Regions:
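Compositionally biased terminal segments of proteins
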Residues: 1-207
Length: 207
């Protein structure tokens, strides 16, 4: 189980409709629910559901960040907006939270927040491009499920996101961009692992 997920679950109880966890943490939660093992992962990839978001969630989120004492707070420019919070004061909190939002300033920062620019790596760039796609964003909203009090993207919906990221990174590496081969392999392996959770009768129309 991902370190700190219990404090996250308790803190955001009642806000399950306003976010979705994707990526490795979603895989870990789904695989654990299915009684299966998953690779170690330390970060929570959090997508805000803009249509359901209210100001209380933003306040609650920043209270959590402050209580966790994250040493590094970073923010990207442009849309979608991306935040990264890392190095909390204890392992009671997730080692890293990566938050994506399609709307600029969807959550308001307290005046005393110290936040620095965020360098964009290949994984962030790939996911940002996917979330900017209206069809993929609608697809994400359709695939939300609550597992043990935490909202994640269901396996049948997570697989297309992983496959899309794999294709995107593979194409970019072939075009000469610097892309870590480990990231490409990670997404492919996750797809194979997630297929263990799929009911053969399940039908999903991917974008």
């Amino acid at each position: 189980m991902v370190t700190g997920i219990d404090s996250f679950k308790e803190w955001f109880k009642g806000y399950e409709e306003q976010y979705a966890i994707i990526g490795g943490t979603a895989c870990d939660i789904l695989m654990t629910e299915g009684g299966l093992d998953f690779r170690a992962t330390k970060d929570i990839d959090l997508v805000l559901i803009i249509e359901a978001l209210d100001v209380n969630f933003g306040k609650k989120f920043w209270e959590y960040v402050k209580q966790a004492g994250y040493e590094h707070c970073n923010k990207s420019s442009g849309v979608p907006q991306f935040y990264r919070f890392s190095h909390p004061v204890s392992n009671q909190y997730p080692a890293m939270i990566e938050l994506f939002t399609r709307k600029l300033d969807a959550i308001q920062l307290p005046e005393d927040t110290v936040i620095t620019p965020l360098p964009i790596d290949e994984d962030i760039s790939s996911l940002s491009a996917i979330l900017l796609d209206d069809d993929y964003y609608e697809f994400l909203k359709q695939g939300k499920v609550t597992v043990d009090g935490v909202t994640v993207l269901d396996a049948a919906y997570l697989i297309p996101f992983k496959a899309k990221a794999w294709m995107d990174l593979t194409d970019r590496k072939a075009a000469g961009e610097h892309v870590d081969s480990k990231n490409i392999k990670k997404h492919k392996n996750d797809v194979f692992r997630l297929t263990e959770l799929i009911d053969p009768a399940t039908k999903v129309v991917a974008p």
